[in-house]
Amino acid sequence: MKHVSAPPPVLDELLKTTALSKAIKFDLPITAPYHAPHLYTAENVNTILCGVDDVVATTIIPIVSSSTGTVVTSATFRDALRVAVEACLQLMIRSDLIAPGIASHVQHADGFAIRHIATAPDGLALAVQTALSQAGGRSQSGRVNAPDQNDTTSIPNALSTPRAKAKIAILSMSGRFPQAPSMEAFWHVLENGIDTHELALASRWNTRTHVGDLSLKELPKNTSGTGFGCWLHDAAQFDARYFNMSPREAPQVDPAQRLALLTATEALEQAGIVPGRTSSTQKDRVGVYFGSTSNDWMETNSAQNIDTYFIPGGNRAFIPGRINYHFKFSGPSYTIDTACSSSFTALHLACNALWKGEVDTAIVGGTNVLTNPDMTVGLDRGHFLSRTGNCSTFDDGADGYCRGEAVATLVLKRLDDAVADKDPVQACILAIATNHSAEAASITRPHVGAQQDLFASVLADAGVKHTDISYCEMHGTGTQAGDAGETTSVLQSLAPIEPPNAVRKQHQPLYIGAAKSNVGHGEAAAGVTSLAKVLLMLKKSTIPPHCGIKTKINHKLPDLPSRNTAIAMEAVSWPRPVNGKRQVLLNNFSAAGGNTALILEDAPEVPTLDVPDIRQCHLVAVSAKTPASLENNVKNMLAWLDEKSDASNLTLARLSYTSTARRIHHPHRVMINATSLDSVKASLRTALDLKKGSSRPKGTPRFVFAFTGQGAQYAGMGADLFAQFTGFRADISRYDQICRQLNFPPVRQLFEDPTTFCDATPTTLQLAMVCFQMALYRMWVTLGVTPSAVVGHSLGEYAALYAASVLTQADVINIVGSRAQLLEKHCEQGSHTMLAVRSNAEDLEAALGPSGLTYELSCHNGRESVVLGGTKSQIETIRPTLQRSRMSNRVLEVPYAYHTSQVEPILASLAAVARGVHFAKPAIPVISPAFGTVLTQSEDFGSDFIVKHCRNKVNMLGALQAARQMSLLDEKMMGIELGPEPVVIKMVKEVAGPAFQTFASSRKDEPALNILASALSAFYTAGTDVKWTAYHADFPSAQVVLELPAYAWDLKEYWIQYVNDWSLRKGDAPLVIERTTLEGTCIHKVVSNSLGVSGGELLVEADLSREDLHPMVQGHKVYGVPLCTPSVYADIALTIGEYAKQFSGEGSTKLGVEIANMNIQSALVATSDGKPQMLRTHASYDAKQKSLYCTFSTLDDAGKVKEQHSNCLIKLFDVEAARTALKSSAPAIKSRISILQLQLNEFGNTFRYSKAMIYKMVGQLADFDPKYRALEEITLDSDALEALGRVNFTKVSAEGKFHTNPAYIDALSQLGGFVMNGNEGVDLDKELFVNHGWASLKLLEAIDPTKTYTTHVKMTEGTDKLWTGDITILDGEAVVGVFGGVALQGVPKRLMSYIVHAASKRTNGVAPRTAGEPQTQRVTAPEVVSAVVKTTTKQLVTQAPVEDRSITTAISIISQESGVEAADLTDDTSFDDIGVDSLLGIMVSSRIRDELGIDVDSAAFLEVRTVGSFKTFLRGLTGTTEQFTTVTKTVTKEITPTELRESSFAQSAVAGDSFGVWTNVLAILAEESGIDVSDLTGDTYFSDIGVDSLLSLVVVSRLRDEFDLDLPEQSLFIDYPTVASLKARITGCTRSPSVFSDSDATTDVPSVFSPSLEVETTSEDFQPLAFSKKEALVAVAEVALTPLEKADPFMSIGLASYVESLQRHQPHGPYHLAGWSAGGVLAYAVAQELMATGEEIATLTLIDSPPPTDGLDRLPRRFFDHCSAVGIFGGEMSAINPSNKRAKLPEWLMPHFEATIELLHDYCAPPMPLTTNAPKKINLIWAGGCAFGGKYAPLPPASMVGEDTEGMKFLTEQRTDFGPDKWTDLFPGRHIDIDVVEGEHHFSMMRGKGAQQLGGFLRKTLGLLA
């Protein structure tokens, strides 16, 4: 049997040969080239052995060589290894010699036994056994298998520790602890001795109902005796988008699981773990181990409404499973439950897995989030819990533990792996063990003996003396017996008092402590919480104070001082010993009897590297998943750099290493290329200002690798890369070895010593060039940059073939070396040369052809770049002619004239060399200049290729153009030159386009590391996954992981509140429970309700026309207009507030509802026509403030907010506290009441008014409905404006369901209004006072309609005639309520009349138009005209300014109201000067709203202070600009109906069921995912928003059930990963009918024209475009695009609609298509779509259309603004729509422009194939002028660099080249007719004289002219 190895393609060919075709063969799992002497040299062997010392060693067991069969003799270990390495790499295995060799060696031994240990193949083993038996050996029975080797990708180094004895390194830790959302915050709690216990948070459960009264003999069912705990206040916060979780799923996921994700991610980040970066972080070698002991969330919270994610969200097995799933780890995941020791048990399992080699990295943690009150009740009833507060560890009064919450995660590796991977190490675990207290008196009690056994075990396993332990972190739950028992076991083990040699010396103190006294007992997370504390202690070198002893130390503890043991009552310094380590014992036990303990020690000290980092430029990366997180990450980095500027370990190189190689990178990216830390900070600030990284790359960029040709070499090329990069140096060394093996000159010296360059032969230089390029290729690939296509110039094409896997390295070197040697042998150096000329081939021929000069065209590099070749004399002869023709030229420094006849003598020999080469199929396309095309098949290569490559001219331009046409090259790609200088890549850019980014690999006189840094920075920000570890590999001093700021999460709260205390009633008989409801007389429907403990919103509505509410809202009539009183809003707010009390966490009886800041914004008039009139109330709950902000608005018929009338703030207040406060003010109020009553009997101005008199007194102001007349009498002091009233509700109807009847509220508040409108000093004919709301309404008890109440108020004047007063409400002597800050505004009577009647008109008449509201555009079909139509042509004579009617009317209103003549209201008139104050502003704005329908805020007159600025302001609202009138003379012309019909454009409106379906699909997606519809943009990835397989099932099921859409359940969101792709799929499923015009379907020449603007069909401007009766010009209006649809795929939506519309008019071709501007792009796309279906295109006309080779550039907003401002859109476009001259642009126009451009932005049109159904004639019509060439003001310069795009220049710059431009690339090989509309620009060519020229060109194209 023979073993044969070779490269796979070669081996395949070998096995196909006749000799081996029938041989028995099988593959071996060997994929490296072993036993290959042609590949390896002695130098390779020495490289492998370079780390092995040459130590003398004696061989104990003889080693028999597998190559010779003889015993290896070696004096040193290094020699023995050399023999082994040589046998592996260079020598053949001689199985036939092994067995005889062994037998020969042992044959002289006196009797020996043979025992087979199975380490070799059975055949070889049998041969050896047979040979030994023949030599006299005795066979022993049985077979011993070799030790089982666990698979691991870790390769231990010579100094590594055996795996089973390795220390376990803790790399990092992250956690959430009570009052500590981070590790640093946790240290703050510890070092300050903070006790974090408090009553249960309202988000957990209501302590008032769940904590029983301890004074009772027996606690109520399911209540506990304590409400204390240590809580995570931010447990609800989570970044769902980061973890691809939908807002629907996130609340259902247990907060413990969510926090485990957050902390695991933070821990991995701090550890610098990038999955897959090293062998120990391969995803299948990572395991996750978590301790968790309860399922609170799914038992209590999510179980209240079980949904799709109930199981994966709540089951604790998903805690580690979710981490594995998110990071795609495929190692084991375990959830461990051993009660209180769960997390330490998980840690134990993880350590065991590391020691056994089951995993190489372990993620370990514990979680404890308490939301189920039952667990607390059970623990309390089991006497576990303290009823007095926190864990009082070591306290004499300790009475149990306090439950605590925590989630923490740490990352572990074996120490050897961590050191090898340059990981940060915080501490090391030496040993960990677990046992059980089997002998304990109770299962829940620990056993001293068992714990002592455990401590002895871990100390022995760790090899640590008990006196070396300087600190013990106790379990320390806080019971007298438990603390005493644990302390006894610890001290007996660590600080015994006998025997004497075991006693601690004075310098060996032991400290004990427990974190539970600070943060409670974290139960399943208790162990990792203690570990977090100790890690912080090691980091801070401090033992924090113990805060558990509240009274005195537990008297049951052993005597501590006698054992040199102490409890730190204040912070104690704990420095690391010099040249030593601190060692700690941590103890953790379980209520179920388990005990776990571990030994921890300091991390090994990291040696300082003195090797400097020679790089000048360093790259610093910041990335995030969302723009918000990116911004905060940058800010955090800046703050960190400021804080750590003096840190000793902070260097720019280490910052670069940590932020690049040791971070997982996200889509939103910022990269800084800096030379100092200060420049990093400056660049980060710039990135913030410019919002860099706010948009994410749309994908990974594609690269073209360009390989330099001959002539660019220079001395020192690649020298710095050779010196600085090990991989590059190794590649060059390997190529040098191949060169020598193939008998070519060596090349390595050119990279080591640049001085050797001068003496190098052409062969050496050419070999060095291709070796350099191949090494560069491997360098880029190592860095993660791979090409999608390659191109090489001349010699560089060989390296390109290697990059494309066509040739091997050896084959490239063989061909290039042979070619060069043949040239040296057969061609004379220096006899020929080459000349680079700046010209195109045609002009060159024109210049040189007539002269008869001889030359050869060697290279066609670009449109204006060619290279000539010939003899030196030929070249010198033609140079003068070229200079006379102004063709710049340069002689190239080359020894031969390549690609000319000079090389012909070598072609036959070169072909012979090539025939021995294997050419493989290209792995990527090869853009081949040798053939001027793209090569993709193995058949494209061979010996013939090599010959033609040598002789043919280099047609670089043709090859690149071919690649462009095949879409293998475009300007969105990136290009890298692989060679000494960036030469070829410039040629690529010329064809690819100006946006094509180019990068060099090397430049003369520029450090290669700087070049590399610049390129990688660009690649990274474009989305490339750079292999940063390789980038930093050769710079060891940089490889230190810094503790950078944690990821800035984009946190939102997700919480399901436990409600209604249902846990208290488990097992009870069903009860009819009265729930707080919202519906009533003033609230008819709950639209939506998300109120909860953490916040939320509520939307309710009421129909004011409904019979139960309608009378209430017509209670006050002012000037005959029924107005709704604020009391209606108050009742709604009180109802909402009462409902919200259940979420406050307080008892409902304790809290009252306050209606604060009631602000009346506008009058609400109730209609009387019986039609529905909806009042909507929106309430937003602020959980922290316990308040709700409310707005009250009416809706229009479409359900949209029409007008907001009022707003207020609902507050929850403590009733008893408010009662106490009011009680203190009651005496003063009662005193004032008494004084008023006494004044009635004295001479003065105080009078009492009866009920009849009260309402009669204000009758001319307001008519009160009887139900609102509850004031029985008032006593009024007109001088003091003070009054008291008596209120009685016996005559007020009690019908209806209210919180507080609005009539009651209104009556109690009326006193203030009567004081202001009924005092003797008021003149109601001139002025009156209206209610503007109040500051506060508090009712301490419900209003009793059977009682009589007293009210008191005193009004005081404020500013601007606003009067306020506090109305106190008394029930007898008791104050039961107060209206604080009741506000009444003085208003002129006529203004009030305006306000009221304007409100009435808005409600009952035509509502005024709100400024800026989009207006519906009505498109009508052309009418059938039966009479002569007169058209007019207006000829310009003069222009004069004229004001818009709205402006003149507004000025007239100001004139009338102010009394100032309109003529005097000039632009510079100040409103202050003419007395326009806030009140007059209200009147003016009211009239403008009423008469003009323009909604002007009265506050505008306080901000806009002059008439001129007011006009500008008003124009902004109406969308108009200052206009000019045109004085014209009019010519009338009659047109017949036939002529009119023939000249008109028929509009087509695209409507479609598909978009309706899509809208519903969006709604389902939003509903099921919880994402707002507005966030479902086209580029949204479903995976990013958490649409997983479960949600996919739900969505697909609903689509099937509701819309009969049959979509794949499992793969829908895999096949269509973005919103845009799904929309294309959905809209493609459903039909999109179009309405087409009824134009003459029998016409001979149908054409399609695609205008971008609305065109009025009667416009004479377009008459020249009309054809004769038998010819129809049909317009298909563009698809009405909106911003929502702008990101959708073009082909699937807009294009389909065009084609459908066209084929409704004309089912089949031939078609004549035309389009103007972007419409030309659409016409081109429609043509291709029709051709694809087999339809024929007769003609295609493109009218001033930009070529869509690379999509259309976006136009900046300032372009549109400028066009509007100078009149292009207001003037030119009005000519297109003459009936609306100078009018405001349609609302749809700008969005349509922008959406069209956005639609076509990514449409890179493919070339049109040259098929039989392609257009027979292609016509391109350019506009001859430019709009900004004089007629209109030029566009001002951009304020930002890069804002002006090439696409904008198409419209803003005068065209000078009227050729086909880039359209020629889209019609390869086709002739394009070109016409120019002279004297017209882009926007005017479609009308008037432009249209006359255009019509002629169209007729010519259509063949309608003779």
Curated annotation (Swiss-Prot):
Top-level taxon in the UniProt lineage: Eukaryota
Catalytic residues in the record: 340 (for beta-ketoacyl synthase activity), 475 (for beta-ketoacyl synthase activity), 521 (for beta-ketoacyl synthase activity), 1116 (proton acceptor), 1306 (proton donor)
Enzyme Commission no: 2.3.1.-
Alphabetized Pfam families for the sequence: Acyl_transf_1 (PF00698), CurL-like_PKS_C (PF22621), ketoacyl-synt (PF00109), Ketoacyl-synt_C (PF02801), PP-binding (PF00550), Thioesterase (PF00975)
Region of interest (Disordered), residue spans: 137-158
Keyword Phosphoprotein assigned: yes
One MF annotation (Gene Ontology) recorded for this entry: 3-oxoacyl-[acyl-carrier-protein] synthase activity
Domain Carrier: 1441-1518, 1552-1630
Catalytic activity, as annotated: 6 malonyl-CoA + acetyl-CoA + 6 H(+) = nor-toralactone + 6 CO2 + 7 CoA + 2 H2O
InterPro entries the UniProt entry points to: AB_hydrolase_fold, Ac_transferase_dom_sf, ACP-like_sf, Acyl_transferase_dom, Acyl_Trfase/lysoPLipase, Ketoacyl_synth_AS, Ketoacyl_synth_C, Ketoacyl_synth_N
Residue intervals of the PKS/mFAS DH domain: 1084-1393
Induction notes from the record: Expression is up-regulated during the late stage of P.nodorum wheat leaf infection and is controlled by the cluster specific transporter elcR.
Pathway in which this enzyme or protein is active: Secondary metabolite biosynthesis
Function: Non-reducing polyketide synthase; part of the gene cluster that mediates the biosynthesis of elsinochrome C, a perelyenequinone phytotoxin structurally similar to cercosporin. The first step of elsinochrome C biosynthesis is performed by the polyketide synthase elcA which catalyzes the formation of nor-toralactone.
Protein name: Non-reducing polyketide synthase elcA
Species per Swiss-Prot/TrEMBL record: Phaeosphaeria nodorum (strain SN15 / ATCC MYA-4574 / FGSC 10173)
